[in-house]
Amino acid sequence: MTKKKVMLVFGTRPEAIKMCPLVNELKTRTDEFETVVTVTGQHREMLDQVLRVFGVTPDHDLAIMKPGQTLFDVTCDVLLKLKAVLEDERPDVVLVHGDTSTSFAAALACFYLQVPVGHVEAGLRTHDIYSPWPEEFNRQAVDIVSEYYFAPTEASKQNLLNEGKPESKIWVTGNTGIDALRTTVREGYSHPELEWAEGSRLILITAHRRENLGEPMHRMFRAIRRVMVDHPDTKAIYPIHMNPLVRKAAHEELDGFERLHIIDPLEVLDFHNFMAASHLILTDSGGIQEEAPSLGKPVLVMRDTTERPEGVAAGTLKLVGTEEDVIYREFSRLLSDQTEYEAMSHASNPYGDGHASEQIVDVLAG
């Protein structure tokens, strides 16, 4: 039996969280697959943390990260460096994930060399090319050149069908990010920051998106601080992104507030367990919108659009935008209205059962 050579290409922390379960599933089936892992290093330190947690060792590391890198740098470097790897390895299929510049450039490189692409987390859409930016363009572009579409939900599948993608190439698998939680969330987990927050309602915050930099981020932080002043039984932890512009805004608005700790980015195992310990989550992240519902945590999404409307429809997520008064109102309501809180925390999870990787590998084996 000839083995199928599958290459997985990823470069950021969120991609790694969702691709490592797939790597490990492929490696349980060595009689069917030869698995090749190529990382671009788009997010160097944060990527390496995730690889360690899941025990994944890359076969190729393009090591593209450099100080002050732009979208031009990432796209050009991945495109040029991946060419040699693809020509050397000659994979039967290349799997990319989601909406990053790594995924876009890798898919384009595969297209130029006529290597089939499988898009994990295909079909997500906001239908606004600049929100989120550049992610909405990236994922649409990847879907143009893909041969396999692994859609996390029926709504994602419908987006692809609406764009004319053939139904025979679309599989609804659930989201591999839910698979990751099965590895990382642990009974009896402890951490000094969680011990500090014990006895309070813990608010977990993440905020880093490009389109929120500047005044929107300042508004978000001011709203959070106002609400927490009103609710002295809360404590907040904000694992802050490495982006210096994010750090500047956070320190300007939040420094000196003793019940809110700004800490360095957490490794994925820690972050998932912080989510499990939290009362609610405020975020502008994509992946957290999928992971938190699996843990029964309400999520306020500080964005104007989301490519994950299933969570909004299910009631686990609420879009609150970036206006200070709106965030203040909705955050206050969740802390004050137990009925609202219970409704959001017990809503159904639309993102799968934690076995998406197995389904994807079954398709590739077919």
Region spans (language model):
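Nucleotide-activated sugar donor-binding and catalytic core shared by glycosyltransferases
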Residues: 1-238, 243-366
